[in-house]
């Protein structure tokens, strides 16, 4: 890692000829890591025939976004066309760790409601390298498929809580998004159904990445992580599209450090529209960027 401590992507999705697909389509952007493996950085759902722009923090993958980087993009469409412009904005500073690595844990389509395989996510065990000082599980999950022969409109419109098992510990995950207003402030066509809430996505939105911290297992002396993802069943053509990654770091540059990753209030972000009006103290999200666990923080505002 070089002289940058964060990277933020600006994604512009445009209709240069005005004939963009009028339906929401799945898309994703991947980068090739130093080991030659492709890692999904952004999961995107296109808006209904409109142009939109998005801001996405990719600092978790800073270690693989320096130098000459190869990207590829896929959009699951056969009608109309889209143009994607991806700009990476780097911010000067010393990174949290000298080294990093990302490995796919789950990647692909996982059917819900297959009675021959009610738990499609297999159990996976990873060995931690001795040099790893921080690890986390980054989870990209979106639900798709629905219809009359389907229970509870799974998985696109099915609001359920799944269980992630990390070394036996249970972590609840609820892949669900309120789509009205659009979390990314993307204005869809009024003749569409963009306003329906969905499982982990909305039309014209970059899918949120949920993170689960694995570092406590390292500090407790454990050398492996056993990951098992349990899902509640739907039926019919229902499926999750998943890309879960084990991201690890080593060579901490700071013993005690922190950074502000988001400002909830005051904010003009649509996703914080209910909290963004400041009536008292500001609300922020911080990240521990040092090797020592934070126990207190002094903030001057």
Model-based region annotation:
Residues 1, 14-94, 143, 154-251:
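Beta-strand-rich ligand-recognition modules
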Residues 25-27, 133-135, 160-162, 292-299:
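Short beta-strand/loop motifs in extracellular/secreted proteins, especially
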Residues 55-58, 121-124, 208-212, 264-269, ...:
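Short structured motifs
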Residues 116-121, 220-221, 275-277:
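Solvent-exposed, conformationally flexible loop/turn segments
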């Amino acid at each position: 890692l070089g002289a940058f401590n964060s990277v933020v992507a600006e994604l512009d999705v445009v209709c240069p000829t005005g004939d963009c697909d009028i339906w929401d389509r799945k898309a994703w952007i991947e980068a090739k890591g130093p080991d030659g493996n492709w890692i999904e950085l952004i999961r995107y759902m296109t808006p209904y025939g409109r142009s939109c722009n998005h801001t996405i923090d990719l600092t978790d993958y800073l270690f693989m976004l320096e130098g000459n980087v190869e990207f590829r993009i896929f959009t699951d469409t056969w009608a109309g066309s889209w143009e994607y412009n991806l700009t990476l904005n780097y911010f000067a500073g010393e990174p949290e760790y000298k080294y990093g690595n990302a490995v796919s844990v789950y990647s692909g389509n996982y059917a819900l409601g297959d009675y021959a395989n009610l738990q499609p996510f297999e159990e996976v065990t990873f060995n931690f390298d001795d040099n790893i000082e921080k690890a986390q599980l980054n989870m990209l999950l979106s639900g798709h498929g629905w219809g009359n022969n389907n229970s509870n409109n799974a998985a696109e419109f099915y609001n359920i809580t799944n269980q992630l098992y990390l070394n036996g510990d249970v972590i609840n995950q609820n892949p669900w998004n309120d789509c009205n207003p659009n979390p990314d402030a993307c204005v869809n066509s009024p003749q569409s159904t963009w306003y329906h809430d969905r499982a982990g996505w909305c039309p014209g939105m970059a899918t949120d990445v949920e993170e689960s911290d694995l570092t406590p297992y390292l500090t407790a002396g454990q050398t492996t992580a056993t990951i098992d993802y349990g899902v509640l069943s739907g039926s019919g053509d229902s499926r999750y599209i998943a890309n879960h990654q084990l991201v690890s770091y080593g060579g901490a540059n700071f013993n005690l450090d922190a950074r502000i990753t988001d400002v909830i209030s005051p904010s003009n972000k649509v996703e914080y529209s209910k909290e963004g009006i400041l009536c008292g103290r500001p609300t922020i999200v911080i990240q521990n960027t040092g090797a020592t666990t934070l126990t207190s923080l002094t903030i001057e505002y």
